[in-house]
Amino acid sequence: GKPSRRPDAMEASSAPMNAPVHDRIAVIDFGGQYAHLIATKVRRLHVLAEIRQPDDPIEAFDGYRGVILSGSPALASADEGGLARAVLDLPVPILGFCFGHQEVAKRYGGQVEHCQREYGPARLTVSGSSPIFAGVPAESTVWMSHGDTVVALGDGFSEVGTSRVPGDDHPHRNAAIADDARRRYGFQFHPEVDDSEFGEKMLENFAVGICGCRPTWTMHRYVEEEVAKIRAQAAGKGVFLLASGG
C-alpha cells in the first residue's frame, strides 16, 4: 500500500528509563514499510506509541497498555519473522496488521497459507459487534497488501470482517478476527494507511477503547518533558550536542 502523506518527522524512541508519564502502546516493527506510520497515527490520538523490535527482551514490554504488531515482508506461512512468542502471551490487548494478524491467528491455533497476492483497495464488510469496530460502518474501503491469508481460526476467535477486491466475486475470509475475551485482534488490511477510510477510528477503538489509554500525549508536552529531563541530567555539566546530520 501507499500512504497519501509521509509520517511525522519524529521517530518513536525506545522506552524511557523513568516511569512513564503517559499511557503507552508498543508497536513491534517486523520490517514492514508502515511501522513508523502506525506509531504516528496512534500519536495523533494523543496516545504515546513507541517502536519496539521483535527480539527485544520481554521485560522491555513492561508498562505498556497494549501492543500492535506491524506488517512484514516475511511470510507467516513459512514461520519467518522471528517473533518472540512470549509477546503474544502478555496480559494486555494485542492487535496485528497483515503479517501481525497472521501471527496472532497462528499463536492461538489458527492456520495460515500462502495465497495469490492482493494489493490495493478492498471493500471491508463488518459483522458482529466487537468493540474493535465500534462506530465503524458495515462497509468501508481498506488497503490490502499481502501474500498469505488466515484460512482457519483457533478456539475463541471469530471472523468479524470479510473483504472483497474489485473484480473478485468471492469474499476474502477472516479479513478481521477477534477474541474479545482475550483481547486479541487481527486485521489482514492496513488501517494505518490513509486509503483505509475508517482506519484511525479502528486505531482509536483499540488504543483508547480497549487498551484504556488516556489521550494525554502531545508533541508540545513531549518537547517540554524531554527538555526538563535533559536539564536535570545535564545540570552543572558540559553538553555535547549533535544536530541534523551530526
Question: For each of these PLM feature ranges, what is it?
Answer:
Residues 81-97, 102-200:
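Pocket-forming structural segment of enzyme catalytic cores
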